[in-house]
Amino acid sequence: MTDELILVYNYKNLKKALEYRKEELDQKIICFDFISHKHLRKLGISHNFAEDYIESKEKELIDNTTREIMFSWYDNDDIKNCLIYKNLNLGWLLENELYGYFLEVIKNFISLKKIIKDEKPKKIVSTDSLCAISKEISKKTQIEI
């Protein structure tokens, strides 16, 4: 059980997140992006990488499921007609952009769920986006933006 988790969503939030570090507390820093991970490693700051909480089989399942959804949603009969313009399905134009976005969101959600389950923190300090997801996953943990 960890007293406090400091979640770093991206590099631009890293400096703010590090302000919450206190040597006397049992804290764990977990970053969700590779740039923050590299920077923390360069600074010699102990941390974990969020994706390390997901097993490779789960990563593959997340990737395949996201791909299956994102490359077929616009062909759904219920919405297909709303997306047709001059015989072109506009949903097709969005598939690559949406795939990357949803893949990141789903990976972050699964990572966060596993992190909270494994670490059992008393408190989570995070940025806005991860904070909202954390609140949905763990109603018992004190969460601070």
Set out the residue ranges of the language-model regions.
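Conserved N-terminal ligand/cofactor-binding loop architecture of enzyme catalytic domains
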Residues: 2-145
